[in-house]
Amino acid sequence: MSIAKNIENDPSKGWVVQKFGGTSVGKFPIKIAVDVAKEYLSTKRVALVCSARSTDTKAEGTTTRLIRATEAALRPAVGSVHDLVRIIETDHVQAARDFIQDVGIQDELIDAFHADCVELEQYLNAIRVLSEVSPRTRDLVIGMGERLSCRFMAAVLKDQGIDSEFIDMSHIIDEQREWRNLDASFYAYLASQLASKVTAVGNKVPVVTGFFGMVPGGLLSQIGRGYTDFCAALLAVGLNADELQIWKEVDGIFTADPRKVPTARLLPLITPEEAAELTYYGSEVIHPFTMSQVVHARIPIRIKNVGNPRGKGTVIFPDTISRHGSATPPHPPKIMPDDISASLANKGATAVTIKDTIMVINIQSNRKISAHGFLASIFAILDKYKLAVDLITTSEVHVSMALYEESDDGNMHEAFVELRRLGTLDILHGLAILSLVGKHMRNTTGYAGRMFCKLAEAQINIEMISQGASEINISCVIDEKMAVKALNVIHKELLEPLALHEVPSQASMLVEKPWLYSA
C-alpha cells in the first residue's frame, strides 16, 4: 500500500505570507489549514505568521493572560502565577485534543506545551524574586503566547497532511551587534534574518512566531501589540513575496462599519494612504508603520476573511508606483485596464468612519507668552504626559484639540493642571470624530461643503472641523450620541451614489486571483 506524500512548498513558486490573528487561530484552525493554507499551496509557496491564541475576545486571550501573569509576579495580590500559567497550559492542551486527530502528533504537542509553560513559570518566578521586570524579560513572557500558538498551528497543519515546521523567532537578533537606532537599516536586517530562518527549512511550510527579538528597548515598547503584523510585513519584504495576506474575521475593508451602516459595501481596492487614515480614525485595518514596510517594497496587501476564504477581500496597493518600481502619475498602475484606472481616479470618497470616546479641549491664551511660545508650551505638555492628539485647530490665541478620552487618567489630570497655567481651559466630553476618507476627493469639488450641509440638514451639530493639507480626509467632531445617525447620513448622501459608478467588472477579476500583480 502506497503512503500519501505530505503536501509541501514548491520551490519554483513565488511566496505568499499569511498572517492570522489570535481569534482566527483559536476558532478556525482547521479552516486555516484546509481552506486557506492547503488551497494556496497549489499555486504558491506559503509562510504562516500567527498571533497568540484567543477564543472569543482579546480580554480572554493568551496575551492578556500573560500580561496578567506578569502583574501577578510583581504584585502577588493580583493572583497566583502558578494558577495563571496552568490556565494557559490547560487551554492549549484542550485545543490540541479538540483539533488534532493523530495521537502521536497530539502527544508530542502536549509535551512541548508543558515544557514551554515550565520555562514561562521560571521567567515569572524570576520577576517575582527581583520585584521588577525588564523590557527583555517582559518580551520573553509575552512572546510565549506566539510560541504556543505557532506550535499548535504547525501541529494542525501536520495533522491535515501538510509538511510544516514551527519556527521560533524570539532570538533572531544577534546580541553581539549594537543598534543605537531602530532605523531603516535595522528593519532591513530584521527582514533578512526572518527570511533566512524561513528558507532554512527547505520545502516545509513554515509557521512563524509573530513575536521576534530581542529588540533593543523591548518589542512591546518599540513596536506595540501590533508586532505580529509587523513581523509578517518584514517577512514578506525579506522573501520578496508576491503578496502579504492579513486574515481576519471580516470580508475586508468596507465603505463604513457594516454593523452600523446596513448599506455598507466591500471595497475591492484601496490605497495605503486611505487604509492608514481609516486605521487612525477608528477602523481596524493594519498599522500604517507596518503597511509602509510592505508598500515601500511594492508588495500588495490583501485583507481576507478566514470564515469566507473564497471571498474577494480587499487589496491595498500603492497607486503611485508599479510592481517593478517605475513611477506613475497619481492614479492606479497602468498594469490595470484603462477603464479601471479611470474609475478609481474619479471615485472621490472611499469610506466614512467613526472614532468614539473623544473629548475636546479648548485653550484660550492668557497672552502672557508669545503666540509661538503658547503653541510650543502646549505641545511640550502633551509630550511630557504622552497624550496623543487626534485632531487640532489653532489660531494665534486659541487651540482646540480632540483626544481619546480613555487615556491615562492620572496623566491627563496632571496635563490639565499645567495647561490651565497657559490660559482658560474648556473641556467637552462625550464626543466622536466623524471622518470621510478618500485619496481622490481633491479631484472633485465641494466634498467638504456637501458633508457639512448634510449633517446640518440632519440636525447634527459640529463642535470642531479639521482637514489636512493632503485633502485625504475631512474630519469633524460631533456628539457621540449622534455618531451612528451621522455615519448613515454621510454614507447615504456621499458614498451610496458612488455605487452606481463602481469599479468595472474587470476589477473583480483582479481581486479574485491569489495575487494582484502578474509577471
Swiss-Prot record:
Enzyme nomenclature, EC number: 2.7.2.4
Key words, A-Z: Amino-acid biosynthesis, ATP-binding, Kinase, Methionine biosynthesis, Nucleotide-binding, Phosphoprotein, Repeat, Threonine biosynthesis, Transferase
Keyword Repeat: yes
Pfam family membership, one: ACT_9
Pathway note: Amino-acid biosynthesis; L-methionine biosynthesis via de novo pathway; L-homoserine from L-aspartate: step 1/3; Amino-acid biosynthesis; L-threonine biosynthesis; L-threonine from L-aspartate: step 1/5
GO CC terms: cytosol
Residues modified to Phosphoserine: S326
Post-translational modification Phosphothreonine, affected residues: T328
Domain ACT residues, every copy: 436-518
Chemical reaction(s) catalysed: L-aspartate + ATP = 4-phospho-L-aspartate + ADP
Single GO molecular function: aspartate kinase activity
Biological process, per Gene Ontology: 'de novo' L-methionine biosynthetic process; homoserine biosynthetic process; lysine biosynthetic process via diaminopimelate; threonine biosynthetic process
Family classification: Belongs to the aspartokinase family.
Free-text function comment from the UniProt entry: Phosphorylates aspartate, the first step in the biosynthesis of amino acids that derive from aspartate (the aspartate family of amino acids), including methioinine and threonine, the latter of which is a precursor to isoleucine.
Protein name (record): Aspartokinase
Gene: hom3
